[in-house]
Amino acid sequence: MDKLIITGGVRLDGEIRISGAKNSALPILAATLLGDEPVTICNLPHLHDITTMIELFGRMGVEPVIDEKLSVEVDARSIKTLVAPYELVKTMRASILVLGPMVARFGEAEVALPGGCAIGSRPVDLHIRGLEAMGAQIDVEGGYIKAKAPEGGLRGAHFFFDVVSVTGTENIMMAATLAKGRSVLENAAREPEVVDLANCLIAMGAKIQGAGTDTIIIDGVERLHGARFNVMPDRIETGTYLVAAAVTGGRVKVKDADPSTLEAVLAKLQEAGAEITTGPDWIELDMKGKRPKAVNLRTAPYPAFPTDMQAQFIALNAVAEGTGTVIETVFENRFMHVYEMLRMGANILVEGNTAIVTGVEKLKGAPVMATDLRASASLVLAALMAEGDTLIDRIYHIDRGYECIEEKLQLLGAKIRRVPG
């Protein structure tokens, strides 16, 4: 397994381009199964999860065509099997997203119960109950979800999500595009990635209103046609590089970004003492060599502070002036990075869903281990400002969500290299 070796203490300075959003690209790829003509998706990030989704399509008989710019054309008419097998699904939770489109378009699906990041219970029952409300018959047996549409296809339904679920909202919204009649999804996720998926579906001919609010209305149509669609910029990758500059007292300009999707994060960075300037598709952060100030934050569904930026801000607080409290309300068991940071000399106390972080002057390099995607990114940030060398193991977690992380950080001046395990 590859490792990263980072020599800390370098003030980052420079410009980088932001990749397409993984959390938007995966549902949008799943949505291509709904089309009865080829659909082309552009600005896909070059990530392991994307490769897994494309491999899953290949296993089902859909052979995506990939060009040199990593645009992917999918023609779902060539599908041969409606099974998403365990050996692919186990590595990536997002593979559950093919369930709704397959049942809606082909009348049945068999999808293995998913794997992915080990951060608490992320139940798939909302996906199942949403499809059942639309008339699907679903059995869970042998580790597989087996779903069948009623005769005549799925029917529009009024569905209330007990818990805000991004992938649940996406799956049911996709299924509803081809259902007969109107579907109303209440307490729906409002994330920008949900809006991006809705925009892609609309480009394919779907009738969707209210994406980005907590009530989404979908009027089913007979068919969805081909389209060409650009995936939105990755707001979590954007935030991570902004924090990287902030913790090192440096400056960064991120291009091909979307400031409107990051308001809660930008507000906290300003509170930490960063000077921030934005344009239509860029953000510049400058710490002017200063040490950040500790911030208090509480994660919650969009538009509040994103859980996927929590670990990065714990790294920021770890070297900030003062004490900051971080409350995690979205996932349980999401402070695994804290125990690795303690090995580097951080002063962090975890009580239930709260981490109390008192900043220290300097962290010290140490061997650490990545446990999940965002936790691993926070260890990279901690290493960038630590004294000496940090060796980060199990970085396949990082590769699931960050395209070319070492190359981008090298562009900003970081001393970072990948070594084979």
Swiss-Prot record:
Phosphoenolpyruvate binds at K22, N23. Gene3D superfamilies: Enolpyruvate transferase domain. GO terms for biological process: cell division; cell wall organization; peptidoglycan biosynthetic process; regulation of cell shape; UDP-N-acetylgalactosamine biosynthetic process. One of its GO terms (molecular function) is UDP-N-acetylglucosamine 1-carboxyvinyltransferase activity. Its EC number is 2.5.1.7. It catalyses: phosphoenolpyruvate + UDP-N-acetyl-alpha-D-glucosamine = UDP-N-acetyl-3-O-(1-carboxyvinyl)-alpha-D-glucosamine + phosphate. It is an enzyme of class 2 (transferase). Pathway: Cell wall biogenesis; peptidoglycan biosynthesis. UDP-N-acetyl-alpha-D-glucosamine binds at R93, R122, P123, V124, D125, L126, D308, V330. InterPro entries: Enolpyruvate_Tfrase_dom, Enolpyruvate_Tfrase_sf, MurA_subfamily, RNA3'P_cycl/enolpyr_Trfase_a/b, UDP_GlcNAc_COvinyl_MurA. Coiled coil: none annotated. The modification 2-(S-cysteinyl)pyruvic acid O-phosphothioketal is found at C117. The active site is at C117. GO terms for cellular component: cytoplasm. Signal peptide: none annotated. PANTHER family: UDP-N-ACETYLGLUCOSAMINE 1-CARBOXYVINYLTRANSFERASE. HAMAP family: MurA (MF_00111). Cell wall formation. Adds enolpyruvyl to UDP-N-acetylglucosamine. Belongs to the EPSP synthase family. MurA subfamily. This is UDP-N-acetylglucosamine 1-carboxyvinyltransferase. It comes from Ectopseudomonas mendocina (strain ymp).
